[in-house]
Amino acid sequence: MPKMKTHRGAAKRFKKTGTGKIKRSKAYTSHILTKKSPKRKRKLRKAGIVFKGDQRRIAQLLPY
């Protein structure tokens, strides 16, 4: 059986942590930033964790 392919779009957006969780970046950070408060923009810089329900689906896209 041939090797499974990694979904390249998912590989650019998600990273696996050491404990097996999946990290993601937050949305709403690229433009229209003037109306967003500094506190909100600061919170958007921090990485988020993928929810349990979505984690299995994303893990299938990232086999390695």
From Swiss-Prot:
Alphabetic keyword roster: Ribonucleoprotein, Ribosomal protein
A Pfam family: Ribosomal_L35p
UniProt-annotated stretches for the region Disordered: 1-44
Bias (Basic residues) ranges: 1-26, 33-44
Disulfide bonds: none
Family classification: Belongs to the bacterial ribosomal protein bL35 family.
Protein's name according to its UniProt entry: Large ribosomal subunit protein bL35
Organism: Alkaliphilus oremlandii (strain OhILAs) (Clostridium oremlandii (strain OhILAs))
Upper taxonomic lineage: Bacteria, Bacillati, Bacillota, Clostridia, Peptostreptococcales
Gene name of this polypeptide: rpmI
